[in-house]
Structure formats: C-alpha cells, structure tokens
Amino acid sequence: MPWPNVDKLSESAPLPAGYRYELLTRTEIPETVNAFASWYPGIVVGNASCHLREDFYREKVVLDGELERDFFVILFKRDHELVGVLSVERDRDSEVLYGRVGAISPQHRGLNLSERFPGLIEALGRSMGMGMVYSLATLKVPYMAEKFERLGWQLIGIIPGFDREMVEPGVVKRVYEAIYTKVLVDENDFMLPRRSAMTPKTAALFDLLYPDKANAA
C-alpha cells in the first residue's frame, strides 16, 4: 500500500485554476507549522496538536521520498504561496486511512478549497487499496460535515470527548465530534454480524446505520 504520486491527485480532486497540490518537503516544515498555528489555533491542544511541532514532521511524516512513514501531508499552493494543508495517517495492519486534520488560509476560503479534503482522503485510500477511510468533523460549525455528506460519506456516530480544543484563549474543553466513513471495498469483503450476537440496543443501532445487513441467524 505505497503512497501515491501527489500529481495524480489533481485528477480525483481538481483545484481551481492557478492552484496545485505538493508534497511537504523538509524545508517547508516551519512554514507548515506556522500555517496550522495561524489558521487553526484550536489545535494547540488535543489530537492534532502534534502538527504544531516540527519534530513530528521530521520523525513521522513522509519527507523527501521516505515512503515507509505513515503520515502524509499535502500542501495546497498558489504560485509560491502556501494556502492549505491536509494531513492523513495510514494504519497498515487494518488497511484504513484516517483524515487527521486540514486547514485553509482565510484569504483563500472563498474558493471552497476545503471541499477537496474528503475527495483527497478517498482518492488516497483507493489508490493504496485501503478498505475504508474515515475522519472527524467538528460540531461547532456545519461546513465540514456538509462536505462529507455531499460526497457520499456516511455519518456513523458522535464521539464524546475523544479530543480537546482551545475554545477561547486559556479555555480548553473536551468536544463532541461527528465521525464519517466511506467504505472502499465490495460488500463481499464483509462478514455480516448475526442478530443473535447483538444486544437489542446494538441491533437497533446497526439497523439504523446499515438497514437489512444483519444476519437473521
């Protein structure tokens, strides 16, 4: 499941004229850290806060051909200007891709560049033969959730307190987030659960999310 060539991503999630994707390089780490800090200050704590540390990129992220690493960071560029960032993480054992965090420069948000995040995550997953892709969406505003739903991702639940955010200067709170997934393999690759193996509450939720898929046995 090698990482794809970033040039091929433009076919799956095309950008407006004048914009392009690039893979993060070692020399761009400081600029990327500063961009996240400026565009998404809430991640100074919590699950995505690693993206504000330069050592995270040097040790964990694909850089200059180090394709064995499990984090992949895509830059959005206009000419020489950095205008957006998307970070994803692969789980080789389960063959799943997690859309970790993305951010767009406020000066370029009118072009709806973040609309490409779900498509990019899916394109990466398909090109690598992943079974599923997933990501989390904030419940503070509806925009990211709307993008996932528009592109056919499924809402499978609300996670309480999985992550923390700085909601205002000096105030850190645990947050609720929506979890969205998209399955990339055929139905035949699944072992369907037996209804007799589920509690009534589990069965009710399963039927709500995946109607007619539980085994009657």
Describe the residue ranges of each PLM region:
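Conserved catalytic-core motifs of GNAT/GCN5-like acyltransferases
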Residues: 136, 149-171
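Conserved glycine-rich acetyl-CoA-binding loop
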Residues: 81, 105-116, 128, 141
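Conserved GNAT acetyl-CoA-binding A-motif
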Residues: 125-138
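A short beta-loop-alpha structural element at the N-terminal edge
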Residues: 18-34
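A conserved beta-strand-loop-helix scaffold within acyl/acetyltransferase catalytic domains
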Residues: 26, 36-106
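Short acidic N-proximal helix/loop "leader" segments that mark the beginning
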Residues: 1-16
